[in-house]
Amino acid sequence: MADKIHIQPFEKLNRFFEECLSDAQLYRSSNYSFLKVFQHALSYDQIGAHSRVLKNYMAWPVWAHAAFLRLKAIVRKSSPQLALHEVVFIDPGRLVSDESGGWHSIYMQKAVSLFPRNQISHIGKKKDSRIAFNATLDSIDRNYSAPDKLELDLLREIHEIVVKTKTTTHWSALQKAHILSALHVFFDDFRFYYKLFKNQPVKSVVFISHYHNEGLIAALQTLGIRSVEIQHGLISANDLYYVYSSVFSAGIKNAFFPDAICVYGNYWKIILKKGVEFTDSQIVVSGDYLQHPEITVSRTEKQKSILICAQKNMHDEYVEYAHSLKPWIEAHPDWNWIIKLHPLEKNKQAYEELKPFNFEIIDHQRSLDSLLRECSIQISVYSTTFFDALGFDVTNFSIQQFGMYRDYAAQMVEEGVAFPLLVSEDPIEKALNLQVKTPPLERHDVYSQLDMNAMRKAILSS
């Protein structure tokens, strides 16, 4: 039976975490903090994702669990190890095409180009015929050799947490099941990456998203390999895994955060510094490594176009909002209405019903930059596309009424990157009557000039 998912605002989840995870002893072992692992588990419980409760052996005594892993190693032989170079890039596989039709990694292309090919290994998460990765994670089996001392040391640390979890009255039975499942996933991920990087010449690994990558970071820390995160989207004070409040000060140390994080501009560094998870020196302003064209927008390029930038897995909300625009479409027949789908949208068919209502649905046919050059107004809820629009002479509107996203939407307005918009408002009339048409933020604060030396130093620093 499928889960009945009840998505909750991040603001509410953050309050819940601050209340139930304020005591770091609940998730801290002798040498590690499993704060983020507990966050994953409790998030799934809160939203009703109970299929995330997995069969596992985390409650077994360490000796029994170790014996079981040794037996599995005999039955399931591990495949030969990949040969890796000094710097490894783990690419999520989001690609962008150039004018000649060639495909490039939107996140990793420029970072990879910093090093000679014989010094790097470019690994994709999944095989993609459009780009030549050195290897892909989905092609590597999860069969392991018998656990060595370092693996067993971590298993003992996890077992400390398991004992605490099972004996405390702080958690419900279902929450305990989620926590043990999350620890199981963490340990399996750790073993996967430990196998991948053990006895290799690797010095640094670059990836996006430190959250849900705790097993990777644990393996790198165990092996003395530098871990570097590069920013892949917006960072907000309302995030679940960034800008941790002082409530978590006792639980942040050794909580599987990367050694450094590269951000697009000083704007993002200022936000991150409000949290307790990174020190100033760990946050490196490396500039805009994404592929944006030079911005030379003139008034004559602008058209009477409204760009609605949809967000991943929010098709229900955006389709409903588009239908509510019917009065304004009829009131402004000389305006064009464009909906740009998120590149990772899984339910693109949901938008097809809007075509008869004068909406142009765009997937990969045109780049975001080309659309921003032409449109006068952009509408979304919370999105990096608001920041992408800086310098393009676009009026950004953030819809404020989608309940579970209202905290993020409010943040967009508070940060000065978008103006508030109610579902009932005519966006064209509102834009025409604004005293100030574009956000006060400067593009260079958000996307500073690419600093190749800063990024290279962040990746290689010991």
Predicted regions and their residues:
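Catalytic-core helical/loop segments in enzymes performing group transfer/polymerization on anionic/lipid-linked
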Residues: 1-462
